[in-house]
Amino acid sequence: MTNQKQTTHFGFKSVDWNEKEKKVAEVFHSVAKNYDRMNDLMSLGIHHLWKRYTIELSHVRPGQSVLDLAGGSGDLTRLLSQKVGDSGQVILADINAAMLHVGRDRLLDEGLFKNIRYVQGNAQCLPFADNSFHCITMGFGLRNVTDKDEALQSMYRVCKPGGKLMVLEFSTPVFPGLKPVYDWYSFNILPKIGKFVANDEASYQYLAESIRMHPDQETLKAMIERVGFEDCHYHNLSGGIVALHIAYKY
């Protein structure tokens, strides 16, 4: 870690730097079983459109190597595996063992195994060689990382020259009038859905808080460029509720 005596945020709470990783792990161990169902309910299924849009802009080709970081239950990995074909490879990496097992079991049940590997690893110190991947995707995971700068540096290291980084993450609404409605939904409805469906209100309260604490579009763009990626730009989806940042390593 950058500074083990430092504090950071866990939702709206201030916690010890080393404590956040443990608390986030507890959240995702708790939500893993109901993760897909909750995503569908919370977004009314729109998260599938955001992910398909990400894959469309990836321009991943057969034979390429792709890292799906914080790949969770495997939505992006499934789509990427179809793009790279049997001659390519997708590595689904996640720090959380419970989420990794959910993703692996789900994709195996769908008959997807020829070109997919599973790795449990920390985004801040990725266990891969330099210049390994043509494309790195990270869907709804960066806001949970303790040291985002360190994670982005690690992604830059393992990205091939000419490769691409794609970060799909909740962001700051830009559509006029959307933010107060979104805030009301996030803090009044999401935790109740979590309590009703998964008997876990606290984890979804953290979800809402973690979104508010995540850097906005321009701040994240600057962070990505600061570690060495170039030509970073972003697409606001659903009025900025979600943003897709794309950047390149030259």
Curated annotation (Swiss-Prot):
**Associated pathway:** Quinol/quinone metabolism; menaquinone biosynthesis; menaquinol from 1,4-dihydroxy-2-naphthoate: step 2/2; Cofactor biosynthesis; ubiquinone biosynthesis
Tree of life domain: Bacteria
Catalyses which reaction?
A: a 2-demethylmenaquinol + S-adenosyl-L-methionine = a menaquinol + S-adenosyl-L-homocysteine + H(+); a 2-methoxy-6-(all-trans-polyprenyl)benzene-1,4-diol + S-adenosyl-L-methionine = a 5-methoxy-2-methyl-3-(all-trans-polyprenyl)benzene-1,4-diol + S-adenosyl-L-homocysteine + H(+)
Q: Which residues bind S-adenosyl-L-methionine?
A: S73, D94, N122, A123
GO annotation (BP), single = aerobic respiration
Q: Indicate yes or no for the key word Transferase.
A: yes
Q: Name one Pfam family in it.
A: Ubie_methyltran
PROSITE patterns recorded = SAM_MT_UBIE, UBIE_1, UBIE_2
Keyword line? Menaquinone biosynthesis, Methyltransferase, S-adenosyl-L-methionine, Transferase, Ubiquinone biosynthesis
Single annotated GO MF:
demethylmenaquinone methyltransferase activity
Matching entries from InterPro entries are given as: SAM-dependent_MTases_sf, UbiE/COQ5_MeTrFase, UbiE/COQ5_MeTrFase_CS
Q: Under which EC number(s) is this enzyme classified?
A: 2.1.1.163, 2.1.1.201
What family name appears in the similarity comment?
Answer: Belongs to the class I-like SAM-binding methyltransferase superfamily. MenG/UbiE family.
Sum up the protein's function in the record's words: Methyltransferase required for the conversion of demethylmenaquinol (DMKH2) to menaquinol (MKH2) and the conversion of 2-polyprenyl-6-methoxy-1,4-benzoquinol (DDMQH2) to 2-polyprenyl-3-methyl-6-methoxy-1,4-benzoquinol (DMQH2).
Q: What is this protein called?
A: Ubiquinone/menaquinone biosynthesis C-methyltransferase UbiE
Question: Organism, per UniProt?
Answer: Legionella pneumophila (strain Lens)
Q: Which gene encodes it?
A: ubiE
